[in-house]
């Protein structure tokens, strides 16, 4: 099983790229994990945000691995504790499918992308910059994998 984080947005600043690379390296023992950055749709004065979201959606769909289990990060999605995420990760491993975690653009996911999601996950009620969400997802996947492996990283 492999995991892919498909994130709509600009190229990550160095501090995000460095943090992501650190968790990606740590996760590599248990779960190969890659980042795919999706170019954001054009927004601004006189531009249609709906069209930008639809354009992003087409690019996200094209980046999905075949037969992947799709988890869309979405504000109204299900909130999981770290322990619950570890249980989900074990369940997903049992399915034998690759995973795709999706971070949408400023207006969220297109209806087409939302319809493809096998489940929706919310980081929580806080509003976070999408770049920070990349790090939170990477860290929480590492924490979940460490819990499954009885690694001492997680101490609750």
From Swiss-Prot:
**Record-linked Gene3D superfamilies:** 3.40.1280.10
Tell me how this protein assembles. Homodimer.
Q: Name one GO cellular component term.
A: cytoplasm
- One example GO MF annotation: rRNA (pseudouridine-N3-)-methyltransferase activity
Which catalysed reactions does the entry list for this protein? Answer: pseudouridine(1915) in 23S rRNA + S-adenosyl-L-methionine = N(3)-methylpseudouridine(1915) in 23S rRNA + S-adenosyl-L-homocysteine + H(+)
Keyword Methyltransferase (UniProt): yes
Q: What biological function has been recorded for the protein in this entry?
A: Specifically methylates the pseudouridine at position 1915 (m3Psi1915) in 23S rRNA.
Q: Which InterPro entries match?
A: Alpha/beta_knot_MTases, RlmH-like, tRNA_m1G_MTases_N
Query: Which domain of life does this protein belong to?
Result: Bacteria
Looking up SUPFAM superfamilies in the UniProt record yields: alpha/beta knot (SSF75217)
Task: Write down what this protein is called.
Answer: Ribosomal RNA large subunit methyltransferase H
Alphabetically list the UniProt keywords: Cytoplasm, Methyltransferase, rRNA processing, S-adenosyl-L-methionine, Transferase
Name the top EC class: transferase
Q: Which Pfam families match?
A: SPOUT_MTase
Q: Which family does it belong to?
A: Belongs to the RNA methyltransferase RlmH family.
Give the EC number(s) under which this enzyme is classified. 2.1.1.177
Q: Which residues bind S-adenosyl-L-methionine?
A: 73, 104, 123-128
User: Could you tell me which species this protein originates from?
Assistant: Stenotrophomonas maltophilia (strain K279a)
Compartmental location: Cytoplasm
């Amino acid at each position: 099983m492999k995991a892919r984080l498909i994130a709509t947005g600009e190229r990550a600043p160095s501090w995000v790229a460095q943090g992501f690379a650190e968790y990606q390296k740590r996760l590599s023992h248990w779960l190969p994990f890659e980042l795919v950055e999706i170019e954001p749709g054009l927004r601004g004065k006189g531009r249609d945000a709906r069209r930008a979201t639809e354009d992003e959606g087409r690019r996200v769909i094209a980046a999905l691995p075949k037969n992947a289990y799709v988890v869309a990060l979405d504000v109204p999605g299900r909130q999981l504790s770290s322990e619950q995420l570890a249980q989900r990760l074990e369940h997903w491993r049992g399915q034998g499918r690759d995973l795709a975690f999706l971070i949408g653009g400023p207006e969220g996911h297109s209806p087409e992308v939302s319809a493809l999601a096998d489940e929706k996950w919310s980081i929580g009620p806080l509003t976070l910059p999408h770049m920070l969400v990349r790090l939170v997802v990477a860290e929480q996947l590492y924490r979940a994998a460490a819990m499954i492996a009885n690694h001492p990283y997680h101490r609750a």
